[in-house]
């Protein structure tokens, strides 16, 4: 989340950790079920799915509540959210990464954000986010496909800009989504606020 006064990173570590446990345990139970020749879901598997549904609902509601509360407290009137059609259907990042990604209900998070924004009187805008992660926000690179890009990822989670600054890759993407929705005036490139985002773990602090 980036705005005129801060950059926030909402940690997904707890959700990813839960997904790892869920996938590993479910795989073990599936193997046992297959060996025993059982066709239907076992009671334990059904309980696991129910528990995961409650966990994800709780995580999405807490995250969306924290975001909207922040917007209200800082008098921010519009929330712009990046979105790609077929996000979970077409993504292919390898087996392990696919499991982590597709088990996070982003559509549910967007839905929670939308109705909480409406209740708070905040305008909610979704915009396609193509090329926002590749283009250099700090260098005001045009957000479109290029043969070569001004900036690049230098290591996991970090993006090196052509202006010589290194920022969090998610912050770079969020800035570009803001540019798509609000125009380049959204950016203040000489500010240091983007370089040290505040990290928030909602599931631990709520």
Regions found by a protein language model. Name each.
Residues 1-206:
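Positively charged, helix-rich recognition surfaces that bind polyanionic ligands
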